[in-house]
Amino acid sequence: MQYDVVGFQTDGDVQNFVRYLISECNQTQKIRVFEAADRHVTLEVNGRKTLIGSFPVGIEPRAFARLARRNEGSPLVKNLVASLGGRNLVIGVDRLDYSKGLIQRLDAFDIFLANHNEWLGKLTYLQITPTNRAEIPEYSELQQALESAAGRINGKYGEVSWTPIRYVNRVYSRSVLAGLYRTARVGLVTPLRDGMNLVAKEYVAAQDPDDPGVLILSRFAGAAIDFRRALLVNPYDAESVASALAQALVMPLEERRARHEALYAKVCEYDVNRWQREFLTALRRGREHESFQSDSSNGEPPNLDTIGVRIAPNAEIEN
């Protein structure tokens, strides 16, 4: 361990890493555990101390909200809204990667349309997935699979005047995305596994608090630990994602406002400035090694129950 500070997104990640180090290294290296501040642990490995902590990365929510308000009326966003013809917009924005659960998401949308034909012709799902790593065969195959799935669903349910899915591979600027988020009635963020996921936070920040959209979020994203008022889903369960989409589209305004207020408060609580401030504070503490008392100085394997890491209730622990 040659670092002063090692940062992770969640408390569960910290606990997993500490457990790994203790189980894999404690037989060959001398490890001592120190109790530190909330969400932080200090380990001494062969005489060198390293602070390990969770630092949930954030955004600048107020600045992003202003950006969304300004770009709601941008030419591209206005053209999109006009083309919708009054239909609800569902949006997903993800890089091309297996971990984002895009195939599973399209399967869920297929099930939603099959189970809720009252929505046929009344909503459009915009999936923005910029092409990357095209030279890697696995990513090229994934892109082809997504294009095939989107085409199949459009052919199955579409009409001459309506296309259920708009699947695009181009890159859009942050300002355009902010305007699109604000326009969307539902944000679909359903990765199979994700350390945090800033799209979820940007979608929340972009919403009009008087008439906000609804966030559907994978419970396997780090953001889900704080975003308990989102509609949390298992992305592997297409039926549950389809049901959440149906719930989001008919959610009463009062409930949408209450959920958004709670989510936006969390986005503001853990913004990028706090992330930066806590990281630098941890680095300072890690170098000074102040206020740390040895918890296991007798050579015995350290007891994880004494480590000062708070795990959120029902938090998903990534292995």
Sequence positions of predicted segments:
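Catalytic cores of carbohydrate-active enzymes across secretory and cytosolic contexts
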Residues: 1-319
